[in-house]
Amino acid sequence: MEKQGKTKQFYMHKIANLLNVQKIVTIHYQELDKTYASEEETHDFWELIYADKENVSIVKEGERVPLKQGEMIFIKPNQRHFVESCGKEPNIFIISFECRSESMKFFFDKKYSVPDNYRYLLQNIMSEATETFVIPDFDPHL
């Protein structure tokens, strides 16, 4: 006996790729001393800075932005900036990357508090990075 089935209908949904990271430039975790201040820099890629322990200041285009433990900020391409400690020994996590997606405009000049239950995602990124890449020790003079 031949089995006759119904013709199934499938619906295809196009996935919108709102953010496309073309390249990872750097990924590193820095344990800074209490008097640390980086050199001012500018570059043609994005940078995400996350304060993992203690607070830091991000100075961008001359404006000081306090970054508390558990907060992150995006530095847009070609924005002058530097990082400095606030009298304690902070730890920061930095990912710099190339992304030309229009959706990145959403992150211009914003900082975010990362909820405790999402911080593990940043830890997973760092873990994957150390398993995948050779990450040199942090040199504060670079």
Predicted regions and their residues:
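Generic beta-structure capping elements
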Residues: 30, 51, 95-100, 130
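Generic protein-terminus/edge-of-domain signal
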Residues: 1-60, 65-66
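Short beta->alpha connector loops
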Residues: 55-56, 77-79
